Amino acid sequence: AGKTRSVFFSRLSSGAGRCKMPDMETTEKKKITFRSLWRLCPACHAVLLISLAWLAAYFLLRENRAVMNFLCKALVRPWHAFAGRLFSAVPFSVTEWVILFLTALGVVLLVLLIVRLIRRRWAKAYRTGMTILSVSAAMFALFCLWWGVLYYSDSFTEQAGLERRDISVQDLETVTRYFAEQASSAGEHVERGEDGVFRADKSDIFRRSPDIYGGAEQIFPCLAAPAVRAKPVLLSRLLSYIRYTGFFFPYTAEANLNADSPACLLPSTIAHELAHLRGVAREDEANFCAVVACMESGDEDYRYSGALLAYIYLGNALYRADYDAWREVYSTLSENVRADLRANNDYWARFETPAADVSEKVYESFLQTYGDDRGMQSYGACVDLLTVYYLDAE
């Protein structure tokens, strides 16, 4: 006990006689200037300013078709070609790990920012806040460059010389019937389970994905791009909860697919996402390209899936336009095709949730932000392209 008191006393007395008067220079508040803030994190400020400058230029010039076409040819398509080749060699989805890393980093930085604000460590809090802001601005700026530009450059329809014109119900019925026949025919040559549902090996479908655009590129040279492999997403079930069958990630130029969804539409969904790699941004055009690619691929699984995708869009349109005609065409479908349609509907019915509804609204807003005024209805616009193209082909 005496030792404890001795130590306490020595510490207390060691400070005695050294009490200092307040230094007026240290207590005087320092004036905050732009230079002092810049010195706290110069790299973050530089990244933020460059990102904001590009974003300002993008939103001012995005209606200038010549500028957007130049950026598309000089920067966007070359980047997608380079990144597509680079990351295609990786057997897993790099995109998925990038998203997980950025999500974790964002959570850590937000927690760190809150802690530093609570502790009034203003300089460190400012650095953390600027890190969050600069990284977010840079990611958005790159997104507008590597994806947004495509919405304002020449569309696939324009590059391919296709036209959209008014179609009659009779025209719609004719092409719907054509794809019903194609689906029924191709459906006889694919692997099925005892329940009659399409059961092809999904890993094998992904393995064959680099080759599916060969035929379509001969018809539409503007679709030429490196032959890259689509990637299954490890957390595919999470995509189902927000009703995503897949997505294209412009930073890595990877086509990422929901491998948990029904196999019957997986090949055509792969073709859809790979259309984005080829500079096809709009969803209706990507669906059209997916159908053409699958039908011209020479691969029975892809051909069946493409015909099924086309029938679904055309059939839904015909259902709204002429129910009796739709019912008559539907009656011509083989039982195998009907089994796949039922299995697909049953699967997605399990994910009719508020989260899925919010996801659809968010994505519709996203499409409209980038000039796709039809929003989610743009998927239905592929009906016009399919009807005109295949009607003329006959």
Question: What are these model-derived regions, one by one?
Answer:
Residues 3, 11, 18-23:
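Short, positively charged and aromatic/hydrophobic N-terminal segments
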Residues 170-174, 281-325:
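Post-HExxH zinc-binding segment in Zn-dependent metallohydrolases
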Residues 91, 266-280, 284-287, 291-292:
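Active-site recognition of the HExxH zinc-binding catalytic motif
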